[in-house]
Every structure is written in C-alpha cells, then in structure tokens.
C-alpha cells in the first residue's frame, strides 16, 4: 500500500502493530480519507474478527474502509456479508492465492453499488492490468466450480497446522496463522542468519530487515515433500548449534 501511496503522491500513515502483531480499533479513530488493511495480515498471518472490522466501519462512517482478503480462504471468516450493512466497506480478493491463478493478475472488489461505481469511474486511469476476455471466462469458471479450490485449501490448512506443531517442537515461536504461510522465529537463532542458511540450501523463505519482525521468517506452506525437506534441514541445523 505505501508503494501506491508514494506513486500517486498521497499522504498516509502506517498503523504500527503492537508486540503481539495486533491492531487496535483506537488506532483507526483519527481523521482520515480512507483506510486499508489486510485480513488475514501479511506477513504475520493473524486474523482480526468481524466485530473488529465493524467497529472500524462504525468509527469511520465518512471514509471508505478497504479490507484486503487475499488469504481469507485459508481459514478466516470473510467480511463480505457486511457490505450489505455498511456502505463504506469495500472487500478485495485475489485469484492468485487459493485459486492458483497468479499469472492472470485477476482480482475482485465487492461493495455496495455506489462504492463500486466510483471504481468504474477511475479504473481505466489507474488499473495497470486490464482483464482480457479469456481471463474473465477462466475467472468465472473458477468461481462457479469452487470445490477443487476448497479441497486444496483444506490440504494447505492441514499441512500448515502440522507445520506449526512441528516447528514448536523444534523450539520455534509460531503465532497463529490463517494464511498459506507461517511466521516464525527461533529465540536463540538470528533471523537473517537462518534465512541465509536456508537459502544456501535452496530453501527460499522471506525475511524483512524491519523493526519488530527482523527476527521472523515467513515460510510458505508447500507440498508434504517440500516441508519434510525443510524440517530435515532445521533438525540438522539445530543439532549443529547444540539446540536439540
């Protein structure tokens, strides 16, 4: 979001998460011309409740509140039903995650008629990924045939929960996740050091050199075979460090 704000020379304020990676409704009770946040959060994977979202909406009746639900299909409760109650809510979702359609750059925005009409007014000026006919048709088929997507999501969720358990057994701190990744750190290993060691072995995870999260790694949930290779590396690495 800051990238686009900078691109269009918009003033903005980032809401800083607390030590537990949580947002607070009070953070949004200040003058603004719009609000956007991801739910589940990236990169933490944490989820805020529908009650939280409703409080933000009620506190900002004159502002559009955009909830980015890129990862919502991996265990979260969507706030889409709230668009019928709150005219200032817009929910955006992508086909790049749960529907495995990343190359198409396809997404949807859901809101009341007036809010969406304003998007139509400006979309050709700001949307750098116009949707071609073939992409539209594939997207429609994907929505009408969601069973395969749901089954894949359940598989990811099952592997994610196993991954959380396994990492905790290895001594990692693992916050709850409602996405297709986990956000982890080891209290006795530097985050960047572990990131580089994994990369050297061809295991790619994400690391950010930013305050509060610089000791954490974001690990995407892969196939069972990929995750077992990841666990095997960690066990060997921790053994070498004398931490197992």
Across the structure, where does each feature detected by a protein language model lie?
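Substrate-binding/gating loop at the entrance of the active-site cleft, primarily
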Residues: 1-10
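Active-site phosphate-binding strand-loop segment of PLP-dependent enzymes
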Residues: 13-73
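Short acidic/glycine-enriched loop/turn segments that link adjacent beta-strands
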Residues: 103, 178, 212-215
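PLP-dependent aminotransferase class I/II
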Residues: 88-168, 172-175
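Short beta->alpha connector loops at strand-helix junctions that form conserved
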Residues: 14-19, 93, 208-209
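PLP-dependent enzyme catalytic core of the Aspartate aminotransferase-like
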Residues: 51, 197-201, 210-244
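Conserved PLP-binding catalytic core of the aspartate aminotransferase-like
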Residues: 157, 169-201, 217
